[in-house]
């Protein structure tokens, strides 16, 4: 008990939310992430169910810190019931943009993934990312 695919024993207690990454409208994988017009139309953000946001005192539009033992990123959030409780969604393809502390500010979901390959695709496990989310502290 307490072990998740691609994770370690105890991951669920420390990282209770599952992160997934969908293909977004404004990028083809990572192509076009530097297009300011598309970023304005489709800003990079994490989607969170209000059920998960409420106990964390997170409101729509807040900057949030998404993290696990592999990495950390900070980006704005969008509260929506379109994401089931217990799951967050970060659109894939954002470019890695670390600050001076190594925290990604670009919203690159890859900073949270394992380097272990999946047995079927021989690629990273994009849908077994266990994370925690909290309201980001002001810089």
Map each language-model feature to its residues:
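Long, contiguous, secondary-structure-rich segments that constitute the structural scaffold
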Residues: 30-47, 51-139
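Long, low-complexity segments enriched in small/aliphatic residues
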Residues: 1-36
